[in-house]
Curated annotation (Swiss-Prot):
InterPro entries: ClpP (IPR001907), ClpP/crotonase-like_dom_sf (IPR029045), ClpP/TepA (IPR023562), ClpP_His_AS (IPR033135), ClpP_Ser_AS (IPR018215). Its EC number is 3.4.21.92. It is an enzyme of class 3 (hydrolase). The keyword Cytoplasm applies. GO terms for biological process: protein quality control for misfolded or incompletely synthesized proteins. CDD domains: S14_ClpP_2. PANTHER family: ATP-DEPENDENT CLP PROTEASE PROTEOLYTIC SUBUNIT, ATP-DEPENDENT CLP PROTEASE PROTEOLYTIC SUBUNIT-LIKE-RELATED. It catalyses: Hydrolysis of proteins to small peptides in the presence of ATP and magnesium. alpha-casein is the usual test substrate. In the absence of ATP, only oligopeptides shorter than five residues are hydrolyzed (such as succinyl-Leu-Tyr-|-NHMec, and Leu-Tyr-Leu-|-Tyr-Trp, in which cleavage of the -Tyr-|-Leu- and -Tyr-|-Trp bonds also occurs). One of its GO terms (cellular component) is cytoplasm. This is ATP-dependent Clp protease proteolytic subunit 2. The gene is clpP2. Disulfide bonds: none annotated.
Length: 209
């Protein structure tokens, strides 16, 4: 995916040239990660990031349906519909999807973190996970429209609760209680809650031991 769209950022993304028997090839960190079957969600969850992630999942499945895909997450969350689009694609593709939180996985991103393949969900030691109810935005319009929107908000809320319950082992009722207000978890607390399976040690420390 040499034309992969780069996330918006304030710093200059470095590029580098790789030399091989086939000649020279210019690359960048995101293309290099993709070659290693790594997807990086480092922005809010919206239609643009969802489309990019879904495309990468589908292409990586086509390249090798038997090799794991790893998704690194550092995201403040975002759109519920975009979340479910990514979620469905993660469950649809054949490869196992390992999820790793570095930085934060908040709101929609926390659900994606939990949705990784069981036993293959992790967080770095100082990662932060936040779960809460889906954001609804301003509700306005005539009475009949308000009723329709109210039903949709409740449907979204129930779907999010059932999804988190499915992947954490909690009951939907417990998830509703826990997400009624912002619930902030450390990496170890996220492990206890069932959002991740392990907290990764630093590679340097692992190498020294």
């Amino acid at each position: 995916m040499s034309e992969m769209q780069m996330p918006e950022m304030r710093y200059i993304l470095p590029s580098f040239v790789e030399h091989s028997s086939y000649g020279a090839k210019e690359s960048n960190p995101y293309n290099k990660l993709f070659e290693e079957r790594i997807i990086f969600l480092g922005t809010q969850v919206d239609d643009a990031s969802a489309n990019d992630i879904m495309a990468q999942l589908l292409v990586l499945e086509g390249l090798d349906p038997d090799r794991d895909i790893t998704m690194y997450i550092n995201s403040p969350g975002g759109s519920f519909t975009s979340l479910m689009a990514i979620y469905d694609t993660m469950q649809y593709v054949r490869p196992d999807v390992q999820t790793v939180c570095l930085g934060q996985a908040a709101s929609a991103a926390a659900v994606l973190l939990a949705a990784g393949t069981p036993g293959k969900r992790a967080a770095l030691p100082n990662a932060r996970v936040l779960i809460h109810q889906p954001a609804t935005g301003g509700v306005q319009g005539q009475v009949s429209d308000l009723e329709i929107q109210a039903k949709e908000i409740e449907r979204m809320r129930k779907l999010m609760e059932e999804t988190l319950a499915r992947h954490t082992g909690k009951s939907a009722e417990q998830v509703r209680i826990d997400t009624d207000r912002d619930k902030i978890l450390t990496a170890e607390e996220a492990k206890e809650y069932g959002i991740v399976d392990q907290v990764f040690d630093y590679r340097k420390l692992s190498a020294q031991n």
